[in-house]
């Protein structure tokens, strides 16, 4: 058992090393998109399924509440948190439309819409990102494996280089924390 624990920790470290090298420029671009949107008076909309929904909700909580700094709330919406909306849309339009219908209702040009999918193949996330781009939103996708079908839809795909879902999720939450930290610094510590 001890060897398995060490193996999993090594795998985690390998993913973090890959983020530091391969994905750092893309993470910087994601931070810039979010900062620019907030400076322009826009908002952040985030979505995912299962564990990715938990990560999306965490991201939104850090923006609306705070990450590290005492500051004003930043507008952000997690698109999976209202069970009445989800079940109404799912029942009337199908599960694939649960996010796109909300993007239709809430997203405006200049907003940043973030989709999270460890496989990169979640149809409901893909449809929402496609609609968001049509509406003039900036789109970011946190993905894993080979990026799946979503990598070609998102303006900025951030693909965690792993095929192991837990490692991908660890990469996603690390990226989210970096974005939250740097967005706060850019907006509230640099006097902008």
Curated annotation (Swiss-Prot):
Chain's role: Catalyzes the isomerization of sedoheptulose 7-phosphate in D-glycero-D-manno-heptose 7-phosphate.
Listed Pfam families: SIS_2
NCBIfam families: gmhA
Span of the signal peptide: none
Official protein name in the record: Phosphoheptose isomerase
Domain SIS: 34-192
EC number, UniProt record: 5.3.1.28
Pathway: Carbohydrate biosynthesis; D-glycero-D-manno-heptose 7-phosphate biosynthesis; D-glycero-alpha-D-manno-heptose 7-phosphate and D-glycero-beta-D-manno-heptose 7-phosphate from sedoheptulose 7-phosphate: step 1/1
């Amino acid at each position: 058992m001890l060897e398995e624990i060490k193996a999993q920790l090594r795998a985690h470290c390998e993913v973090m090393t890959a983020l530091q090298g391969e994905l750092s420029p893309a993470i910087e671009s994601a931070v810039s998109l979010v900062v620019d949107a907030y400076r322009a008076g826009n908002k952040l909309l985030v979505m995912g399924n299962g564990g990715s929904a938990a990560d999306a909700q965490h991201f939104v909580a850090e923006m609306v509440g705070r990450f590290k700094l005492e500051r004003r709330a930043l507008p952000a919406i997690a698109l999976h948190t209202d069970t009445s909306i989800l079940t109404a849309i799912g029942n009337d339009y199908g599960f694939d439309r649960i996010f796109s219908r909300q993007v239709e209702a809430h997203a405006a040009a200049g907003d940043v819409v973030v989709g999270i999918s460890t496989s990169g193949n979640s149809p409901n996330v893909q449809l929402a990102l496609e609609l968001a781009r049509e509406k003039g939103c900036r789109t970011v996708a946190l993905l894993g494996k080979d990026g799946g079908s979503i990598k070609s839809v998102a303006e900025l795909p951030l693909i965690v280089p792993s095929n192991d879902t837990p490692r991908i999720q660890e990469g996603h939450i690390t990226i989210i924390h970096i974005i939250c930290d740097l967005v706060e610094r850019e907006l509230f510590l640099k006097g902008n």
